[in-house]
């Protein structure tokens, strides 16, 4: 029996919802709308040395996590748009570990990514609020996945994803006494 590493997965692993539930979608949209503020609070007051500290041994730095959340949110927003405007679009994954090595993720201050998240999440939440149940049932086809994914599952996944990485930062702060 394997155990989940609580430092890597402080809120547990993603559990896909089995079915569409409007009340879940409302909660996910609220969480997506609130993520930029939650993330900004999680990094508030951290200095450059702290921002350049890995959240775990072998993990990304806090700054890389912030930049990754901007990258992932852009991808999620575009995947949602493709799912709404195309018939079962093929979704190319992005190489997260490689993106985290790029110059912007390694050396840029976090403020541009925080600002990007603020604007993007307003647009994304507004788009999600406009969607019907039929829209949320539309499918995307992630490359390499065993089956197509409905947009409601994509929304749940990225809700978890934002909370997951914010919790990693908060866990590091607690462990370090920051």
Curated annotation (Swiss-Prot):
Class of this enzyme: hydrolase
Pfam family membership, one: DinB_2
Binding of Zn(2+), residues: 68, 161, 165
Cofactor: Zn(2+)
Cofactor note: Binds 1 zinc ion per subunit.
Keywords attached to this entry: Cytoplasm, Hydrolase, Metal-binding, Zinc
Listed InterPro entries: DinB-like, DinB/YfiT-like, Put_metal_dep_hydrolase_YfiT
EC number: 3.-.-.-
GO molecular function list: hydrolase activity; zinc ion binding
Subcellular location: Cytoplasm
Gene Ontology CC: one annotated term: cytoplasm
Assembly behavior: Homodimer.
Family recorded in the similarity comment: Belongs to the metal hydrolase YfiT family.
Function noted in UniProt: Possible metal-dependent hydrolase.
Matches recorded under HAMAP family: YfiT_hydrol
Protein's name in the database: Putative metal-dependent hydrolase GTNG_0529
Naturally occurring in which organism (per UniProt): Geobacillus thermodenitrificans (strain NG80-2)
């Amino acid at each position: 029996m394997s155990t989940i590493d609580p430092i890597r997965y402080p809120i547990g692993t993603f559990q896909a919802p089995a079915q569409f539930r409007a009340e879940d979608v409302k909660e996910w949209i609220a969480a997506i709308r609130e993520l930029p503020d939650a993330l900004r609070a999680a990094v508030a007051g951290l200095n450059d040395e702290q921002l350049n500290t890995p959240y775990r041994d072998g993990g990304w730095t806090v700054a890389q996590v912030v930049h990754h959340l901007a990258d992932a949110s852009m991808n999620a927003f575009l995947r949602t748009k493709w799912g709404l405007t195309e018939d079962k679009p093929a979704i190319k994954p992005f190489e997260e570990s490689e993106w985290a090595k790029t110059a912007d993720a390694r050396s840029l201050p976090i403020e541009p990514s925080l600002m990007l998240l603020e604007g993007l999440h307003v647009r994304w939440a507004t788009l999600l609020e406009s969607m019907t149940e039929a829209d949320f049932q539309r499918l995307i086809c992630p490359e390499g996945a065993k089956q197509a994914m409905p947009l409601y599952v994509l929304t749940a996944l990225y809700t978890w994803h934002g909370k997951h990485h914010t919790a990693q930062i908060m866990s590091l702060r607690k462990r370090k006494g920051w």
